[in-house]
Amino acid sequence: MSEQTTTPEVDQTLDLNNEMQERRSKLAALRAQGNPFPNDFRRDSLSGDLHAEFGDKSADELAALGKRVKIAGRIMTRRIMGKASFATLQDMAGKIQVYVTRDDLPEGFYNEQFKKWDLGDIVGVEGTLFRTNTGELSVHVSDIRLLTKALRPLPEKHKGLTDQEARCRQRYLDLIANEESRKTFVTRTKVVAGIRKFLNDKRFMEVETPMMQVIPGGASARPFITHHNALDIDMYLRIAPELYLKRLVVGGFERVYEINRNFRNEGISVRHNPEFTMLEFYMAYADYIDLMDLTEEMLRTLAQDILGDTKIRYAKEGEEGLTIDFGQPFQRLSMVDSILKYNPDVTRDDLATLEKATAVAKRLHIELMKSWELGHVITAIFEETVEHMLLQPTFITEYPAAVSPLARRNDQNPDVTDRFEFFIGGRELANGFSELNDAEDQAERFQAQVDQKAAGDDEAMFYDADFVTALEHGLPPTAGQGIGIDRLVMLFTNSHTIRDVILFPALRPQK
């Protein structure tokens, strides 16, 4: 007879099935005794609050206080020692230990109920705060109830949920098992709240603009297409809210912002998710220099308020990392000057004509499109050779007009615009510019984009006639900016991939 063997994966599946069957049997027994999912327990305390308020109290002080609490949470660990047990409960604010004894509970409850509960079960506890012999703040339980029976076990304590894709697919398990993941998303919430407070304090008004648009605009990107049955028209998930926000400035809302989703039908990478969150804001009677000043102030404020310091550590995966200092003035360089700084063998004259710049790009093995103008080529050289070098906070200014169809031309040099992109950690974080408010110039640039689309550029913009009409009514001198919330959170949490800061990122369906 041949010997049969199983793989570790099969063994794990068998173990899981056996444990789930055992848990289902326990649930069936609980159902026979009543409702195993009650909803009448009300807590009055959170673990983190108890540690904050009573963490420095001595055992004698706690005994004198006799503080009664009602807490609820998930059983994360448990040590059964005959007639007494210790368990760790986890709630939204952290963890706290509870001490359960047979003699403090109704007769038979400890052995027949409590000892049969499992890790992952959710319980409600009432008891008194005390400090154990080892000095740990704990709750001496006088009453404990099962509130939710978990049918699946938690990830193993030491192995945890370490596979990146599994963490994204089962974010609920990731949040249960990984404290760092929970901290990341708490920080994300604080970042968004901090931005709102900062802008509200400066008299910006938060607004909402359409997520489905007849004409996608405001950025160069490939949109998602859907169909509106009642109107029988194709519509696009928005790639940016920009053109609608500027319509509001025309209408008299002179400081507006929106924090919401954008959708771009593009590739997925450590920096890109097809559905992502952006802050866009617009200020009348301001220019791109005002925006750079405002951005410095906002990021410095967020770092100090959320992280407690203007200096943060940041490292891309596999790299040693660096200290990023928001407390110092941010570097400001024109695009051409940045190319010259990081490419000592390139001269200003090398970038003066399309022919010369193309020769530089070919020498650097940069792919170009035949329809590109000089501005496109200079931008491609910058993106390939400079962008990843911009580790400390840096504004790159004077973007070519050819790649900035919505930005105002510079008064001294109409070939470039009053535009900047903000880089940090070698990655783009923000894009802002003095807005183009010349309706005739805007119409010409839209037409140039249409020509580029006809030449094969799928990311070129559509012609938005209604937006041109809005400009014809008069847009005051305005500056506007977009900041990627996901990338900002990556920076503040030292996360290596955008999937770590989006609760439910896009993934290919499992077969």
Swiss-Prot record:
Its EC number is 6.1.1.6. This is Lysine--tRNA ligase. Binds 3 Mg(2+) ions per subunit. The gene is lysS. One of its GO terms (molecular function) is magnesium ion binding. Transmembrane segments: none annotated. InterPro entries: Aa-tRNA-synt_II, aa-tRNA-synth_II, aa-tRNA-synth_II/BPL/LPL, Lys-tRNA-ligase_II, Lys-tRNA-ligase_II_bac/euk, Lys-tRNA-ligase_II_N, Lys-tRNA-synth_II_C, NA-bd_OB-fold. It catalyses: tRNA(Lys) + L-lysine + ATP = L-lysyl-tRNA(Lys) + AMP + diphosphate. It comes from Aeromonas hydrophila subsp. hydrophila (strain ATCC 7966 / DSM 30187 / BCRC 13018 / CCUG 14551 / JCM 1027 / KCTC 2358 / NCIMB 9240 / NCTC 8049). Mg(2+) 2 binds at residue 428. It comes from the Bacteria.
